[in-house]
């Protein structure tokens, strides 16, 4: 994580303030819903309005137009199962940005890639919903990890030949490293001085392994914090009934059964 003065102010897209942004521009043929050209650029933007997920974003005509465009694109460039709300729209655009950057970095033979290998021996039940099917594949996969170009593999869960994280440089170190690399390779910002020293230090094999270890620890803490946050904000949550899926039944040494439980509404186990 970056210091608060950077993450909440200087580097954050604050409403009404001018900010620099690394941008993927798409040129789309409306008749064929085809991406005919794309390019990466450094831009200066001014955020007119910061929207939140719990507001009626689709009431805004510009947001609605973007939503409909993404929904159509997903028919031909399918990165998510469906586009039903602005959550899905943002997820789609983030995956697309990450993938297009990964393709460029792959050609340049550099970058910090994100790989995820599926356990091909595991076959999920046929009767479960698509979301549960995907979760079970993820649960029984060999896990995702960051790796350099020499060791990178495909992202099987997204069904993409290459993938990087680059859309969240404020909250994830790998995204920041990839932005430094890609902007240097594109001639947008030169790599020198402290910038070069910082990148070289974090791209060492032992540093990448440290990133992988700390990311796993952070995810465990995040899950616990999310659960505590839910319970602290809603006193009635303990009285509600939620849909859940039980899996991975095992018999313990004391002859009792132990299960794993996944709750789709909270995306928690």
Give names to the regions the model predicted.
Residues 1-269:
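Electropositive polyanion-binding surfaces
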